[in-house]
Amino acid sequence: MRFTIVIPVALCVLLIGLTAPAQRKKGYARKPKPLPVVSAIDTEALKGLITQPRERPLLVNFWATFCDPCRDEFPDLVKIDKDYRPQSIEFVTVSLDDFGEIKTSVPQFLVSMKATMPAYLLNVTDPEPAINFIDRRWQGDLPATYLYNEKGEVVYKHIGRVNTAELREAIEKVVKKSD
């Protein structure tokens, strides 16, 4: 009686084991995609990133994985990135997550959003100097979106979930001025 159960089970295990390598060769077993690189950035490097001379406007979005409005607006920002970055603007994101998230939840979130824009994580013990550099009136609320013209001047800012139509309008205006 035992053999009538053991033999069919053993045959099934053997067949599954023999077909697994064939499935891998056919591309059925996928390798996990590598996570995007999220670069650490400190206050001085952030200042340099924003103030460096550039040929195109710069869009910067400050966000965090623990921020619901940030997560909600991210698909819209990814669409804006795809529509404008290749030819019109530079676009970077700066996460204010804990530095320990640089290789885990931050890149995993970016993959889930299909984000391709350069990504940074603010690596400071005190974010106040970075926040004050960006905007003395900004209290650090997230998300925060800033659009800079080629001269490094803020031409659009929004604290909270961005209105996509307003942001697109601001991008169109600054791009037309730079042409």
Predicted regions and their residues:
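Short pre-active-site segment immediately N-terminal to redox-active cysteine/selenocysteine motifs
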Residues: R56-L58, W63-F66, D98, D141
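Short, internal strand/loop/helix patches
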Residues: Q108-L142
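Conserved redox-active cysteine motifs that mediate thiol-disulfide chemistry
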Residues: F62-K79
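N-proximal helix/coil linker or "cap" segments that precede and/or mark the start of modular domains
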Residues: L18-A40, T51, Q108-V111
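Bacterial N-terminal signal peptides
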Residues: P8-I16
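Thiol-based oxidoreductase modules, predominantly thioredoxin-like and allied folds used
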Residues: S88-K103, A115-T125
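A short beta-strand-turn-helix
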Residues: V37-L58, D81
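Thiol-/selenol-based redox modules, centered on thioredoxin-like
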Residues: D141-D179
